[in-house]
Amino acid sequence: MASKKREVQLQSVVNSQNLWDEMLLNKGLTVIDVYQAWCGPCKAVQALFRKLKNELNEDELLHFVVAEADSIVTLQPFRDKCEPVFLFSLNGKIIAKIQGANAPLINRKVIALIDEEKKIAAGEMARPQYVEIPLVDSLDEEYGEVHYESNVEVYNMAVINPDAVLMRKNLEIKEKITKEGFIIEIQENMLLPEEVAREFYNHMIDEPDFEEFVYSMTNRLSCVLIISQGEDTEVIEEEALPQSDDEEEPDPLEEPHVRFAPMLVKKKRDSLQEYMDRQHMSDYCHVEDDAVKVSKFIDILFPDFKTMKSTNVQRTLGLLYPEVCEEEKDNVLDIIQNEGFTILMQRQVVLSEEEARAVCHVHEDEDYFDNLIGYMCSNNSYILVLMREHSVERWKELIGPKTVEEAYASHPDSLCVRFASGNFPVNQFYGSSSKAAAETEIEHFFPPQSTLALIKPHVSHKERMEILKAIRDARFELTQMKEMHLTPEHASKVYFKITGKDFYKNVLDVLSSGMSVVMILTKWNAVGEWRRMMGPVDPEEAKLLSPNSLRARYGIDVLRNAVHGASNMSEAATAISNVFTESNFEN
């Protein structure tokens, strides 16, 4: 009887719609065992629930309930099912479901959600936007008996480990993920913060080398991916067609012949983890699919991501025709910034004939087209990468229609009208036609470039982290990174241009004093941008001429000037090839 009493105290009984509605008023987490009247609640997990209740000791935050599907209208989809179902209600919202008595999974889910609630209550984190799931049985979903749409995007997070990044396996893994139809929403090579590494790999906590593993993940470069499921694939299946009444009866001794008709159906894609397992990529990449945990990791690692997704922040390519570029560029740039655009990249360029034809293709049927192309190919245009919410549409709206005549009639306040030219009756501005077109055009006009960068041994760990943050803030992609002791042999692969100089021995003395961080940094004009960030070679001169540069902030003298970078693209390519080769991976 004592055991029976403990079970009643452990799990409240909900056997009517009114009691269900009252239960949803619970604060915190309520774990609901959905059961059938004929078989009763799942006894296999009651010991786990008791253990969680005792160990977590959070009576105000953690509640356990048994709910009879037969008596509750809301639970109708779960009636007459044999497999146990556990629902997780967080402050009245059903956010997760587990099919079957999967005790380890239930345990992880409860602990993670309670930990979230504690941190929220303590003001240590903002409440994530929890996903409310529809109450649909998994079999119904599989066979299409119930259909629903969710406007809430659910993400997985994948971390490709440092060894795989160093061997460039991350490129292969990303290609396979996208070819399967998954969408990589954001990707970045980074050092994992310790709190993220410990929680993300919490399943390994009992491994004897866990602390060593955490150190590796927080001091070596991993590739972090935030991935959405993408659309389910459409496949053609064949459906049997009934024979018509007037067809001859088949010979009973013959094999029956059934006619099939093609039918387009949606095939549910495997989960990301299942796909990774099937492709034998799990040794290189770990996946987290718990929506609550992924939401938390996104808040820590990519704090702007949710805002950018919800407001549809995007990039577009803008172009100023030569006459505007020469005479009105500064005025136009002021207008662009006043309209809320951020100018990410900009350059002056003379278009090739192919580029000019692509930009001016809307005028190709006009008599003046050839003259326009000649004009575009003989003078400087100004190209920009612009960012804001709905950037593609907003920029096209700002610049107006393709001709001055149309603009006067429908968009008199557009840039087309304000900066109309007498040479050609066309809009003196260009914008990408779509988000996809924008990304293609941006990569064409602002192709990524890589340079070799080095943080010298005298820079402290704290300062090193600050430099890495500055690199990230400057929108460099940290393509590769490794910590190296630059012996004379290794140093000559980086400083090959000065090995014959008198001062080279002094350089070797500085480099041999400790560990350096060697990196490949990638972005458009990477060589020039990194040299600008570094500042003048002498830190004292840097403090006068470029006080915010890295050498001004972290340099001590000419030799210990904090950072180093290639002087030009040729030097960068040679140094990268020297340092980041397969023979050096084990350094």
UniProtKB/Swiss-Prot annotation:
UniProt feature coiled coil, ranges: none
Location(s) in or outside the cell: Cytoplasm
GO terms for biological process, alphabetical: cellular response to reactive oxygen species; cilium assembly; flagellated sperm motility; spermatid development
Gene3D superfamilies: Glutaredoxin (3.40.30.10), Nucleoside diphosphate kinase-like domain (3.30.70.141)
Encoding gene (name): Nme8
SUPFAM superfamilies per the UniProt record, alphabetical: Nucleoside diphosphate kinase, NDK, Thioredoxin-like
A Pfam family assignment: Thioredoxin
Keyword Hydrolase: yes
Protein known as: Thioredoxin domain-containing protein 3
Family the UniProt entry places it in: In the C-terminal section; belongs to the NDK family.
Note: In vasectomized rats, autoantibodies against Txndc3 are present.
Domain of life: Eukaryota
GO molecular function: 3'-5' exonuclease activity; microtubule binding
InterPro entries: NDK-like_dom, NDK-like_dom_sf, Thioredoxin-like_sf, Thioredoxin_CS, Thioredoxin_domain, TXND_domain-containing
